Amino acid sequence: MMTRDELNIILPTLPEKPGCYQYFDEDGKVIYVGKAKNLRRRVSSYFYKEHADRKTRILVRQIRSIKYIVVDSEGDALLLENSLIKEYQPRYNVLLKDGKTYPSIVIKREPFPRIFATRDIKKDGSEYFGPYPGALIAKGMLRLVKEIYPIRTCKLDLREEKIRQGRYRVCLQYHIKKCKGPCIGNQTSNEYESNVSEIRDLLRGNLHRLVRMYRDRMQAYSEELRFEEAQICKERIELLERYEAKHTVVPRNIDNVDVFSYDEDEHTAYINYMHIEHGGINRVYTLEYRKQIEESKEELLAAAITELRQRFESNAHEIVLPFDTGWQTGESITTTIPRRGDKRKLLELSEKNVAQYKLDKLKRAEKLNPEQRALHIVHGIQKDLHLDRPPKHIECFDNSNIQGTSPVAACVVFKMGKPSKKDYRKFHVKTVEGPNDFASMREIISRHYTRLTEENLPLPDLIVVDGGKGQLSAAYETLDKLGLIGKIPIIGLAERLEEIFFPKDPVPLILDKKSETLKVIQHLRDEAHRFGIGFHRDVRSKKQIQSELDNIKGIGKKTKEDLLRHFKSVKRIRSAEEEELSALIGRNKAKLLYEGLRKK
């Protein structure tokens, strides 16, 4: 069984997405394949709870490593599970090992072709779509087909000569208008085949194309005043729009194909490999390469294609790639770089898995070495803000006042991307009267950095000012007077659009909302707000208490401080009972205070 330390590293990094997981034993053999709507929750359940089932307990004891494949939906996970179980025949999978398969939908190769669900795939020229994750889903698709199109359900031999002989009579389906009666010659082969062509599109998932087609027809019929036909088109559009495909289907004509995708970070290239066979994904593997100087992604992917095809003995006749690599293919091998369609969807699935693999590797590295995560963040900030050095020490300033009363300011400090609360500073604004944020910023920046330089204390690697161009200009001018321009970079964050301003640059930088750099800067700003507003509230409360308590005889400075510390506000002091006040400041003072406040 895997150790607790190994599990603590692996399990928290698993994605909370649908997919399939594979358990391997000490020999590297797949012993179990499962599907999950949420991979992290499902896999964790094997290790974090007791199992009554003896087979499951034995399985868990034999697990030595875990791999997974991310897909788009729970339905896809079910399909992929089926493919992987058939490929590896894992010892602990008791279902599906007998070769039982999920249903497909077939369009038979025959006159007026029948369309129905089947588990029996025959090489008779018929077209198969699927497999579908369960009979209910296949039947649901057939129900949609039959609601839209009047197709036959009988098993009659509808060759032309037999129809001409008049050997058949219409059935109930004809009378309830679910079939147009090709058996008695009421529907031509061309008209029926036109419906079958549209059904192919529907089974391939091309719903949007069908909806567009029916909209165009509806418009044309309306203009020609053919309202009955227009109404039929409208009903078909509504049926299609209500139906939502819950899984991606690998068409059966995509067979024996290798799919490769590429991702990279500063030092490593990641290449994901998927092999498609018989309409299913039966192998997924991600390879890592240590990047060398001046080695292009084309060269790395080309090398990986050769290695992975040899390792897994692939004889795929087609290779799907994200970009041209210059890889030399044999005469019998086709290279495809898809822009749309089913192969593009497969490439996107491979790209999703390689991106998840890279993310999980980073998370596991951070689990083992939290300092690496912090270093990664500050280097990201350096890159995004074009700084000369990584900002390991950042200071952020915020002013706080209400209509110019009790003006204060706060400075919060982040070190290695995290708050360093012991270094936070509060400031009373001393030289500014009235609401003047720019003048307040000049005073605080001047006082703070004059002290740091005079006492030879370390300067920050970056200053963040809460506010737009005006606040930034005020702080920049003050740093210039102190001779610190060029020594400390400074930026301003405008709150409305989260724009980042640089001194003397009218064009702001707008980072992606998911950017780690923006998240750190927002955290700085929010922390400065919180710290500054809290300080301002305390100052106002003290002033309020002083103003209301100053004229009460016998209540001195020390008593006021005790009252503020305990009750936090004048309102609470006023609502307190005399006994509660007595317990804090004594009976005599409590009586004076209680009576004095009520006179007011």
Curated annotation (Swiss-Prot):
GO molecular function annotations of the record: DNA binding; excinuclease ABC activity
Domain GIY-YIG, chain residue ranges per copy: 16-94
Keyword annotations of the record: Cytoplasm, DNA damage, DNA excision, DNA repair, Excision nuclease, SOS response
Compartmental location: Cytoplasm
Organism domain of life: Bacteria
Record's keyword annotation contains DNA repair: yes
GO cellular component, one term: excinuclease repair complex
GO terms, biological process: nucleotide-excision repair; SOS response
Span of the signal peptide: none
Predominant cellular place of this UniProt entry's protein: cytoplasm
Presence of keyword DNA damage: yes
Pfam families assigned to the protein according to its UniProt record, in alphabetical order: GIY-YIG, HHH_5, UvrC_RNaseH, UvrC_RNaseH_dom
The UVR domain, residue ranges: 208-243
Assembly description: Interacts with UvrB in an incision complex.
HAMAP family: UvrC
Family: Belongs to the UvrC family.
Its job: The UvrABC repair system catalyzes the recognition and processing of DNA lesions. UvrC both incises the 5' and 3' sides of the lesion. The N-terminal half is responsible for the 3' incision and the C-terminal half is responsible for the 5' incision.
Stated name of the protein: UvrABC system protein C
